């Protein structure tokens, strides 16, 4: 939606812009059946940049909680590295609804319930997209002067790009982390800023807890967190073999919650603003940015 809003703003709303979403309107931007399983931490400078450039400002309820930075802890938890910088914890269920509202006010059109499968080509250029209308099961085709791909790291459009381009189409499996998280409420247990700090996003580096990745405890209030972890699959296999276990990501997350001494009686959030987004797993890219982001008639944004 940010790409659409930017295009609308800089064209003075003179471009015809269409956003295509596979979801129905009430769940715009939803990643999986479980919710918007993606990052909800953002730097204040990024939000300020957006406000300055395209005159969009976020507030409550899409911004849920302010933070002062990130604190990363070593495996023995004796050493910490601070990364100071104001930021926000976003409510990923509410944010897309705000973005949709802002986009419509800027003249952006939205087509819901369409799953895109491939790009359309003509004379060596991308000229549109095609897929399926999920409500009618009929073919969907739409031409465009430029296609902006925001379908994520597993993009079928990028993977199937068939014109001459410097864009890397396939992503190495080792550059993807299997991740998951719960949004939880809790009572306060032991006052330990290593396990929970309402002012800082906490990262735990530990190859037993999160092999090839890290665990996180991100505050979403005084008694609410986004808690989860990410792992590299081959490192998880090595860890399981070393420890004689057969744990998966979900088991690791649940064990991670159990060892958190600052959280007493943790349970999934019952806030209406989290109603379809309290838990879930997803694949996250941890690689560098694609060296080339454009082809003739085609552009990548975000994780794509």
What are these regions (language model features)?
Residues 38-41, 82-102, 182, 237-248:
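Short beta-strand to alpha-helix junction loop
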Residues 211, 215, 231-304:
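FAD/FMN-dependent oxidoreductases across multiple families
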Residues 1-19:
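N-terminal Rossmann-like FAD-binding beta1-loop-alpha1 element of flavoenzymes
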């Amino acid at each position: 939606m940010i790409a659409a809003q930017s295009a609308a703003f800089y064209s003075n709303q003179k471009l015809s812009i269409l956003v295509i979403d596979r979801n129905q309107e009430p769940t715009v931007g939803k990643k999986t059946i479980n919710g918007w399983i993606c990052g909800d931490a953002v730097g204040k400078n990024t939000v300020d940049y957006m406000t300055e450039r395209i005159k969009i400002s976020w507030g409550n309820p899409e911004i849920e909680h302010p933070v002062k930075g990130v604190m990363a802890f070593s495996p023995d938890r004796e050493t910490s590295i601070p990364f100071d910088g104001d930021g926000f914890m976003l409510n990923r269920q509410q944010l897309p609804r705000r973005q949709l509202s802002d986009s419509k006010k800027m003249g952006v059109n939205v087509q819901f319930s369409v799953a895109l499968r491939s790009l359309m080509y003509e004379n060596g250029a991308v000229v549109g997209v095609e897929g399926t209308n999920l409500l009618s099961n009929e073919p969907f085709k739409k031409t465009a002067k430029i296609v902006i791909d925001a379908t994520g790291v597993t993009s079928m459009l990028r993977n199937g790009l068939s014109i001459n381009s410097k864009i890397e189409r396939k992503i190495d499996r080792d550059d993807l982390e299997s991740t998951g998280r719960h949004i939880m409420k809790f009572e306060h247990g032991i006052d330990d800023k290593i396990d929970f700090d309402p002012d800082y996003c906490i990262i735990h580096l530990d190859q037993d807890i999160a092999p090839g990745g890290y665990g996180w405890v991100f505050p979403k209030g005084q008694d609410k967190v986004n808690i989860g972890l990410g792992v590299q699959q081959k490192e998880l296999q090595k860890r399981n073999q070393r420890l004689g276990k057969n744990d998966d990501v979900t088991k690791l997350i649940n064990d991670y919650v159990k060892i958190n001494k600052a959280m007493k009686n943790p349970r999934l959030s019952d806030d209406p603003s989290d109603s379809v987004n309290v838990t879930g797993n997803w694949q996250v890219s941890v690689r560098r940015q694609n060296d080339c982001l454009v082809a003739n008639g085609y552009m990548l944004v975000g994780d794509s």
